[in-house]
Structures are given as structure tokens and as C-alpha cells.
Design a protein with these regions (language model features):
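Extended ligand-binding regions for polar small-molecule ligands
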Residues: 2, 50-53, 124, 205-235
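Central regulatory/effector-binding core of bacterial HTH transcription factors
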Residues: 29-89
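Short beta-strand-to-loop elements that line the ligand-binding cleft
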Residues: 59-67, 86, 133, 153-165
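Secondary-structure junction motif
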Residues: 86, 129-152, 218-225
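Basic, amphipathic "hinge/linker" alpha-helix immediately C-terminal to the N-terminal HTH DNA-binding motif
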Residues: 1-13
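Flexible hinge/capping segments at coil-to-helix
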Residues: 25-26, 94-131
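Beta-alpha-beta core module
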Residues: 92-98, 103-104, 165-215
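Ligand-binding cleft/hinge of the Venus flytrap
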Residues: 49-56, 125, 140-155
Length: 235
């Protein structure tokens, strides 16, 4: 037992020394710019940022949110180092496509809506209700086209600038808010019910990833990606 514990301690020390050596070699890359989806409401991203800041206090973290296409453009043109986003196109070989999770789709409905009494809701049933999307004004048409023609959400569409505004619209009975379980979702409160969205007898799932440019990758990006993956997958 002594030799096991001593050996484990030496391995931990060696790992820490290796991490520190790599870190010192990248001190000039002391900023990490993170983009995430405007509709993201999980808790793990914030936990990962906090833990990363504790481990690497020398790194300045800059965070921005946006729609899928806004984040994609920021990454392409060097506005951010890494983005947390959904997969909407085939993976590109120019980027690291770091898969986090296949996430279940949910609909947030007012408890006043009769559908809220069910255990799940069918995609076809939701077509009778306005779909509330979180989007900037400039990206509304893009988001509507994707949700309607790719995911199959029908009916009419309404837009909110952020999740708080979107949930207020739900409480007011104006429609439903589609959301994905990227990690741990916060409680919705007494006025809203969150139901799995199904096609037939299967819940709809979507892929969420971290993306970064292969040519601009570094140790800090990889460390942050590993932290977030562990938190989201509860490893």
C-alpha cells in the first residue's frame, strides 16, 4: 500500500510538472476567448470557466454569445478561440470538432397550456403553437429556416433577444421555447413545464460540440475543452 500511494504521488507530481512546463511555454497565449450559444442555459459552462480560472489565473477569459452562424463567423475570422455550438453541417477538417454530448430536445410551455399536462410532446403537436426562438434581429430568418426546414418545427415563429425574455413570453402564453439539455438545466419555476420533444416514440436529440481552428489550437483550449467535457458528462 505504501509503494502504491508513493508511486501514485510521484505520477501526480510528474503530471503537474508536465502541465506547468507546457503552460510556461505558452505564456504569450494568455487570453482565452470563448463563444457560446445565445440559447444556452446549462450550468456546466460557468462551472468550467470558474475551474479554469482557478487553475490558470494568468489567463484572461473573454466570453461572448451569439447564434450558431454568428459564432461560426467569429471563429472563422479570428474573433474567438473556441465556440460551444450545435452541429448543423458536416464536420470540417480545418477545425477540431470536440464532441461533448448528444442532447435531448425539450419544449418549455406555460402550465396553462393543456399540453403541459402530458409527459412528453410530439413535434406535430407543437406545430399548432408559435415557436419562440432566441436570436439577434439580424439572424432571425436564418434561425427560422433551420428550425422549420431542418428540425421540422412548423407553425409560426416569434423571437426573443435572450432566454429571460423568451421565458417571459412562454409564461404569457405566447408560444413554446425549444431548448436542449446541454448538461444540467436550471429549474423553470412554477409557471413553466419542460417536456421532452418526440418524433413518434423517440425523443429528438442533437449534437453539441466545442469547435476550434486546428492551426490556432493551444494547451489552454484543450484544457478548457477537457474540463467542460468532464462536467457535462459528469465523469
Amino acid at each position: 500500500e505504501y509503494f502504491y500511494n508513493r508511486g501514485k504521488g510521484l505520477l501526480d507530481e510528474a503530471d503537474a510538472l508536465c502541465r506547468e512546463t507546457i503552460r510556461l511555454g505558452q505564456d504569450d497565449e494568455s487570453t482565452l476567448r470563448i463563444g457560446y450559444l445565445r440559447c444556452y442555459s446549462g450550468q456546466e459552462l460557468y462551472q468550467a470557466v470558474a475551474e479554469f480560472s482557478r487553475l490558470y489565473p494568468e489567463v484572461s477569459i473573454h466570453i461572448v454569445n451569439g447564434t450558431h452562424e454568428e459564432l461560426y463567423d467569429l471563429l472563422r475570422f479570428g474573433g474567438v478561440d473556441v465556440i460551444l455550438s450545435d452541429q448543423r453541417r458536416a464536420f470540417s477538417e480545418e477545425y477540431v470538432n470536440f464532441q461533448l454530448l448528444s442532447c435531448g430536445c425539450y419544449a418549455e410551455l406555460s402550465v396553462q397550456n393543456p399540453l403541459s399536462a402530458e409527459q412528453s410532446v410530439q413535434l406535430e403537436e407543437l406545430k399548432r403553437l408559435p415557436c419562440i426562438l432566441i436570436s439577434s434581429r439580424e439572424q432571425q430568418n436564418v434561425e427560422q429556416d433551420y428550425y422549420k426546414n431542418t428540425l421540422g418545427f412548423g407553425g409560426s415563429f416569434l423571437f426573443a433577444e435572450n432566454l429571460e425574455e423568451g421565458r417571459l413570453m412562454v409564461v404569457g402564453g405566447r408560444g413554446f421555447l425549444p431548448i436542449e439539455s446541454i448538461g444540467t438545466l436550471p429549474p423553470v419555476g412554477a409557471s413553466i413545464r419542460r417536456l421532452p420533444v418526440c418524433r413518434g416514440d423517440r425523443q429528438i436529440f442533437r449534437n453539441y460540440c466545442l469547435f476550434w481552428n486546428k492551426e490556432h489550437g493551444n494547451y489552454y483550449i484543450e484544457e478548457f475543452a477537457g474540463l467542460l467535457k468532464k462536467l457535462i458528462r459528469r465523469e
